[in-house]
């Protein structure tokens, strides 16, 4: 697909399992993106801690028509849960998101701009920070080498 001069559709795929403690901050960070995603797909793997009710309430309270929420009748495990979400996503660019991620407001805008300017890119990752509970920075992780990236792709099952 030639991406130049078109607006790419963005899909965010979130998976949850008993993540109520961190989830509201994460959902707010998605809602506050400078470049709103075209769709947010949330897949819950049978939570029992109030996660399901939190997500349903958040979507309803914020009138998020482009957000879809799925609850597995039977547990699938995190990898299958993510893979199902990625398969259902309709966007040109897919952003997987863990339930405890908090995204900077410019994440989608900046990463999408890079993809639009460089259509040859198939996989783009960004730096991240690991935070302690109160928000103090535990570690900042910078650019991975191609070998590390390939290892991550293979280990987490994003290839056949």
Q: Over which residues does each language-model region extend?
A:
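Nucleotide-sugar donor-binding/catalytic module of glycosyltransferases
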Residues: 2-160
């Amino acid at each position: 697909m030639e991406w130049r001069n078109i607006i790419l559709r963005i899909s965010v795929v979130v998976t949850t399992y008993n993540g109520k403690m961190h989830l509201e901050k994460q959902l707010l960070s998605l809602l506050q993106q400078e470049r709103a995603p075209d769709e947010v797909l949330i897949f819950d793997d049978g939570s029992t801690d109030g996660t399901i009710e939190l997500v349903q309430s958040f979507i309803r309270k914020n009138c998020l028509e482009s957000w879809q929420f799925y609850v597995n009748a039977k547990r699938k495990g995190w990898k299958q849960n993510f893979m199902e979400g990625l398969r259902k996503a309709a966007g040109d660019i897919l952003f997987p998101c863990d339930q405890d991620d908090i995204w900077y407001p410019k994440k989608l805008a900046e990463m999408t701009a890079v993809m639009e300017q460089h259509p040859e890119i198939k996989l783009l990752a960004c730096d991240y920070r690991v935070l302690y509970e109160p928000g103090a920075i535990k570690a900042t992780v910078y650019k991975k080498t191609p070998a590390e990236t390939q290892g991550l792709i293979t280990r987490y099952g994003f290839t056949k």
